[in-house]
Regions:
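Bacterial N-terminal signal peptides that target proteins for export
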Residues: 1-8
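N-terminal signal peptide c-region/cleavage motif recognized by signal peptidases
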Residues: 13-19
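N-terminal mature-domain "stem" immediately C-terminal to a signal peptide or N-terminal signal-anchor/transmembrane
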Residues: 21-63
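Short coil/linker segments at helix-helix boundaries
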Residues: 46-102, 109-227, 233-265, 299, ...
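Amphipathic alpha-helical protein-interaction segments enriched in hydrophobic
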Residues: 229-241, 276-287
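Extended alpha-helical scaffolding segments
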Residues: 270-313
Length: 327
């Protein structure tokens, strides 16, 4: 993951490269999600299976670097997540499996039924707001999902989502050993799939009993596994998402503690080489502002030509405020 720094600065001569990609990330995400939803609603299971297989082959990404696989599954899951009883998503999984008995996608969706029911029980508020009587039922559902995933582990040979789902289960069961063993196995089998690292990172955030040092460990692991083709890109990407999930980490970046700004800066240069989009430039601007790196911020600011995306910036970090602070 160590491309030369000159790559980033030479791109200043071609700002329209970023401009051309200014709206494609959001459009691409919507197209993928809507296509997955359309196949699901119409019951076109063969095309849905083909879509999932395609997105598991080489893990293609959007122009901004988001893996299409997670978007497809997000569209399907989101379609039924509002039904807290889990009946809607369960019915769909049953129909899918009946039509295509060998579908790994149908069984993957069956696993997600447990998650929908668990979220319906627990809600999405702080743990302190949950009725104590709910926890045994919640844990039971997570144990059942774990058992289902283990029974259907052959899915993991064809769909990397299995590992991501098991990491989520491990987080919800507060099973650190399961989370790390799943991460180790999954990253060995599918080293380039970002969301295996992202889900593990989320599960080891301080709010889930983890620490900044554990996030650093996972970010380093992701970077090491992908250094030959991606430089330090994964390091920056994992930490940016960690900061978005847990804004308190901004203090570490600002003070240059635990998080290496030198490595993050290099990682963004590497990522821009792969994904020269305004999404990447927004990531650079936000983190450069937090780290108080005026040089990097101003160079990226020239390239982005005002095409900022406020919704992807960490909580409390605002483009105009950052821009004014470096004048």
């Amino acid at each position: 993951m160590h491309f030369k720094s000159i790559i980033f600065y030479s791109l200043l001569a071609t700002p329209m490269l970023a401009s051309a990609n200014s709206i494609t990330e959001s459009q691409e995400r919507m197209v993928i999600e809507q296509q997955a939803i359309a196949y699901t609603v119409s019951g076109d299971w063969a095309k849905l299976d083909a879509m999932i297989q395609e997105y598991n082959t080489g893990f293609p990404t959007t122009s901004g670097g988001t893996h299409k696989l997670v978007l497809a599954w997000g569209g399907i899951y989101g379609l039924y997540a509002g039904d807290v009883s889990g009946k809607s998503i369960d019915d769909v999984a049953t129909q899918w499996l009946k039509a295509r008995p060998n579908s790994t996608g149908a069984r993957m969706l069956q696993a997600m039924v447990f998650d929908v029911k668990a979220v319906g029980l627990r809600g999405e508020g702080a743990a302190s707001s949950v009725d104590p009587d709910v926890w045994p039922k919640y844990k039971k559902l997570m144990v059942e999902e774990k058992e289902f995933l283990l029974k259907n582990k052959d899915i993991a040979d064809k769909d990397a989502t299995w590992y991501q789902e098991m990491e989520m289960v491990a987080r919800n069961l507060d099973d650190k050993e399961l989370l790390y063993s799943t991460l180790q196995e999954g990253s060995k089998k599918f080293p380039t799939y970002q969301n295996i690292y992202l889900q593990a990172m989320e599960g080891r955030l301080p709010k889930w009993g983890g620490s900044a040092e554990e996030v650093e460990k996972i970010a380093r692991m992701a970077a090491e596994n992908n250094k030959n083709q991606s430089g330090l890109s994964y390091y920056s990407y994992i930490w940016f998402n960690a900061i978005s999930f847990q804004p308190e980490f901004m203090t570490l970046l600002n003070k240059h503690e635990v998080i290496s700004w030198d490595n993050m800066r290099q990682g963004w240069e590497d990522r821009y080489q792969q994904y020269p989009s305004t999404r990447t430039l927004n990531n650079i601007l936000a983190t450069a502002c937090i780290a108080r790196d005026k040089d990097v911020f101003l160079k990226a600011d020239k390239m982005i030509q005002g095409q900022t995306e406020p919704d992807v910036w960490p909580q409390g970090v605002e483009y105009r405020t950052c821009q004014a602070s470096f004048r």
